Amino acid sequence: MAEFPKEFVWGAATAAYQIEGGATEGGKGLSIWDVFSHTPGCTYRGETGDVACDSYHRWKEDLALLQSMHLKAYRFSVAWTRIAPNGGTDWNEEGFAYYDTLVDALLEAGIEPYVTLYHWDLPQALEEKGGWRSEETARAFASYAAKMAEHFKGRVHQWFTFNEPACIVKMGYGTGEHAPGLKLPLEGQFTCWRNVIYAHCLAAQELRHADPENKVGFVSTGRICYPVSEAKTDVDAARVLTFACPDDDWAFTHTMALDPVCLGRWPEPDICGPRLAASIAAVPQYINDALPLGKPDMVGLNIYNAAPAQMGENGPSYVERPAGYAHTAMNWPVEPECLNWGPRQMQEQYGLPMFITENGLSCTDKVYRDGKVHDADRIDFLARYLEKLSEGIHAGADVRGYFQWSLLDNFEWHSGYRERFGLVYVDYATGQRIPKDSAFWYGEVAATNGQSI
């Protein structure tokens, strides 16, 4: 039986572009994902988030699903372009009205909103002025954060500024797999990275200035390595590989995201590749001076898998997985130890309260002849992962809550609607929601604080 702290938070997570739809309704402006998804060849089968799960119109159904699962927290993101259609300070009252209604309904239902301000949908108008290549975008984000904090004062206290800078920068400005689809060299990518970090620091100050009771968080994803044994040499080897920042794999590291915001400094040169180290050395002093001001109250960790590691003859090394190892429909390895060792490593490095802000898997779900969705693979996956999370907490990781990804099947970015991550099945032709077996299972987990696992 898994055991969790008495006040542990159980929730589910979504993101605006992935579920809302209503792409041109309510005064909303164009985001980079509106443009990118309509560009031929950029998404699976040319699919877009124009309608997605239609949560813009069907949010009451989503609220009922959260209630049915006994969840006390909902992590969702705000579409920046609903609030500021062109990314400036011409605020859109219709956008505020939509989120007012959602937030008020959540609070009335006893569900606390955990609001993410940026989950990848940059206003297209800002991208045309340089996007994350420009510090002006960081300043625009701070204005947006200030307005949100002012508007929702007394109602929203849990804020995450950014979701996964690794994906924002590496996939959007490096590989081009995500919006805006650029392929910049490392140096250009790092300029975007430092501007995202700068934006967080500026926004954190605005959120706290608006309401000292606000809690500010920052969500990271990246490489996790776990030791193949409890031997100190293997434990140390896994830690070295987790936090290393080589030039060929620097972005998908928690180090690059969390060192600047949690420790107030960039990663040390001895763990960085030479090009990355040179880019860090060239960061303007005023950005470095802002770093300590961005220290979060909580760290969000999006963790899905990990890599086994050991101390080899020539130093820390990865261990090859066995033939036929378990993997998800998205071909991600199934590695429950990630929720044990990942939080433990982050606790040792940063010493801050943590939330698992995303964890889950894509399955080849279908509606059976009985009209139900039987996703035994997801239940087994979540049970194994949550057992390991419990182990990590008992080993000293200060994890305060868990948000399953995701409440709904949704638009999975460049993969379109091919992948199904939800606890709830969505028929995209009709918008119908069908709770999967895992939704009922997870509801029992939340109701019993994990004792049913």
Predicted segments with their positions:
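Generic alpha-helix structural propensity
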Residues: 54-61, 69, 78, 94-101, ...
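Glycine-rich, proline-tolerant flexible connector loops at the mouths of alpha/beta enzymes
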Residues: 78-91
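Active-site region of glycoside hydrolase catalytic domains
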Residues: 1-43, 86-88, 96-371, 377-453
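Aromatic- and Gly/Pro-rich amphipathic surface segment
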Residues: 30-64
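A common structural microfeature
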Residues: 7-9, 56, 73
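Catalytic domains of carbohydrate-active enzymes, especially glycoside hydrolases
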Residues: 58-79, 293-299
